[in-house]
């Protein structure tokens, strides 16, 4: 099978979407490009176009693409492929052959758009929905008008001043003769009264604080009074309570030294540890010795 017959059979057996997409420049360029070596061989042999396959019987055959033939030209739908092969110059064949392999460059795009425009103008029923026809430009003025139609007109909206004037008579106080004359007639006065009642308890502690400050000032002038009301700044090191201290003092009066069993018993009664009871008795004995030494010195003097 020759190269020309191979490309021609591929062009006829392509699927419908591929055929529809490459009809304007693809198949035409392929058929023209494939015809170039055949024509050169004929010129070398000096023979006529007897070896060129004749596809004239296929030109009138309607394919599944709404009666559009793959071998017809866009300008002359009924013309055959053989005259087109003889009449096309060599440089134009090369140009279409390159545009077939590079479909996204300028020449292929121009031929495609020209085909769409001509087919849409001449035969509107053959225009396909999958063709890349340019979308119509959107009229911005029309869109804006439609958008404005969706929005209610500004003139129908009431102004804030009108709303205030309409609401004001409803909130006006009732006449004094009406039975509704109560605290609700003047809400501002009621709110002020309640705020004043809430602020009164806050003012009383402030007055007490002022009195305490005056007392401290008078106490500072009198040292005897200030000594009585003075608070010790020394941190307590002893964790014993008054009840625990009193019970330990009683136990110390009975016996200055405790046995281990008695120490554990006192610690359990007073909720203390054995070490705490032991330390307290040691400190208490040291204190008693100091007091005895002072008494002796006072007697000797």
UniProtKB/Swiss-Prot annotation:
Basic and acidic residues compositional bias, start-end: 183-216
Residue ranges with Basic residues bias: 93-103
Source organism superkingdom: Eukaryota
Keyword Zinc-finger among record annotations: no
Region described as Disordered: spans on this chain: 33-120, 150-226
InterPro entries: Abd-B_homeobox_TF (IPR050803), HD (IPR001356), HD_metazoa (IPR020479), Homeobox_CS (IPR017970), Homeodomain-like_sf (IPR009057), HXA9/HXB9/HXC9 (IPR017112)
Biological processes, Gene Ontology terms: anterior/posterior pattern specification; embryonic skeletal system morphogenesis; proximal/distal pattern formation
PROSITE patterns recorded: HOMEOBOX_1, HOMEOBOX_2
TM region positions: none
Cellular localization per UniProt: Nucleus
Bias-annotated ranges (Polar residues): 57-67
Function text: Sequence-specific transcription factor which is part of a developmental regulatory system that provides cells with specific positional identities on the anterior-posterior axis.
Family indicated by similarity: Belongs to the Abd-B homeobox family.
Matches recorded under PANTHER family: AGAP004664-PA (PTHR45970), HOMEOBOX PROTEIN HOX-A9 (PTHR45970:SF3)
Protein name, UniProt field: Homeobox protein Hox-D9b
Organism: Takifugu rubripes (Japanese pufferfish)
Origin organism lineage: Eukaryota, Metazoa, Chordata, Craniata, Vertebrata
């Amino acid at each position: 099978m020759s190269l020309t017959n191979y490309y021609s059979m591929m062009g006829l057996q392509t699927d419908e979407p591929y055929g529809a997409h490459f009809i304007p420049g693809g198949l035409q360029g392929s058929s023209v490009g494939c015809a170039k070596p055949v024509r050169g061989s004929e010129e070398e042999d000096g023979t006529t176009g007897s070896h060129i396959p004749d596809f004239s019987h296929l030109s009138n055959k309607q394919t599944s693409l709404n009666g559009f033939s793959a071998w017809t030209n866009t300008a002359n739908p009924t013309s055959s492929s053989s005259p087109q092969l003889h009449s096309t110059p060599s440089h134009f064949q090369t140009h279409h052959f390159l545009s077939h392999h590079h479909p996204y460059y300028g020449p292929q795009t121009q031929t495609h758009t020209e085909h769409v425009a001509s087919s849409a103008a001449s035969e509107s029923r053959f225009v396909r929905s999958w063709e890349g026809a340019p979308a119509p430009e959107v009229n911005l003025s029309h869109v804006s008008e439609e958008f404005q139609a969706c929005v209610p007109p500004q003139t129908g909206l009431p102004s804030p001043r009108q709303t205030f004037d309409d609401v004001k008579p409803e909130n006006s106080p009732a006449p004094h003769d009406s039975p509704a004359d109560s605290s609700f007639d003047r809400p501002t006065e009621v709110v002020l009264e309640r705020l004043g009642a809430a602020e009164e308890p806050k003012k009383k502690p402030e007055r007490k604080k002022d009195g305490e400050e005056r007392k401290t000032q008078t106490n500072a002038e009198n040292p005897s009074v200030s000594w009585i009301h003075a608070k010790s700044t020394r941190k307590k090191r002893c964790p014993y309570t008054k009840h625990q201290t009193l019970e330990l003092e009683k136990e110390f009066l009975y016996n200055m030294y405790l046995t281990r069993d008695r120490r554990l018993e006192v610690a359990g009664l007073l909720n203390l540890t054995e070490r705490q009871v032991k330390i307290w008795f040691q400190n208490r004995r040291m204190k008693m010795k100091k007091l005895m030494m002072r008494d002796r010195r006072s007697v000797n003097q």
